[in-house]
Amino acid sequence: MTASAVVPFGARLAAAMDDHGPLCVGIDPHASLLRAWGLPDDVTGLREFSLRVVDALGGRVAAFKPQAAFFERHGSRGVAVLEEVIAAARAAGPGAGTLTIVDAKRGDIGSTMSAYAEAFLADGSPLAGDALTVSPYLGFGSLDPAVELAAATGRGLFVLCLTSNKEGFEVQHARTSVSPGADGGAGGTDGSPQGATVAALTAARAAVLNAGAEPLGSVGLVVGATIGDAVAATGTDLVAVNGPLLAPGVGAQGAGEHELATTFGAARRAVLASSSRAVLAAGPDPDALVAAAAAAAGEARAALR
């Protein structure tokens, strides 16, 4: 496929959200969930659990989000299961299957970041889903290898911006001595800590990369659904991002229809709500999983559409 023929991730995700509702189901094989499903906490249980989720919900939800750490904890055999899950999702449902966001939160510099990009974003890599979560805290520019390869292959990125863990405050809410410039970078400094917050600068950089994209750009942000007034408090312009907003914390972590609408406001149509435990706890019965996912998708649609 030529570069001009690649359909960008943002366009594919927007279509999937329209078709199935703005819901992403996380595949998080906690030891406790494996036990609840009557499965052993080993590679056999990991594989059985993950593929049951894909088999039950493939073609029924906008995306899956396997959390890489729960596969990596089982070593090389666990990583092989992650590869199998990505391939199964690609085959689940009509057309190109169900989108997969690999939640690995990679972030590094130079050749190391290039290697991560090749592992998770290159055509032909068994670990390459449709998008990857990345960390900007070595500087947004350190993500350039991933940005460039994702654009070339039609894949997407979700950059950590405003996360729901309380520890994120000390970095994401911190004020820098710069303000966003026309290129989304540092627009100037007076040496005092009165400029934009780290979160606002992250959003501004994503907005530049997504400029002119329709219906959505392919560089999204991770913005927790349970962050309260953090968007306003940090001066983060989510509407200007023009990209998808991955919102963990829906369901078991406490975010419902009211929290989604309040947190995201005018940017809510770009939100992809992510639910893991609230859906997975309904298993292992496939019909119960389908019903739980349908209920979660309905709630997300009511809040965001």
Predicted regions and their residues:
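Conserved N-terminal beta1-alpha1 strand-loop-helix module at the mouth
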Residues: 2-101, 288-305
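Active-site-adjacent beta->alpha loops and helix N-cap segments on the catalytic face
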Residues: 73-88, 109-113, 138-151, 226-235, ...
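Conserved, mostly hydrophobic/aromatic
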Residues: 25, 64, 103, 132, ...
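Catalytic beta/alpha-barrel core
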Residues: 65-68, 73-74, 101, 129-139, ...
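A C-terminal functional module that forms or caps the active site or interfaces directly
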Residues: 47, 221, 225-274, 278-279
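Conserved anion-binding
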Residues: 108-220
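Acidic (Asp/Glu)-rich catalytic clusters
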Residues: 17-18, 54-60, 87-95, 147-153, ...
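Short, well-ordered coil/turn segments that N-cap beta-strands
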Residues: 19-23, 59-62, 94-98, 128-130, ...
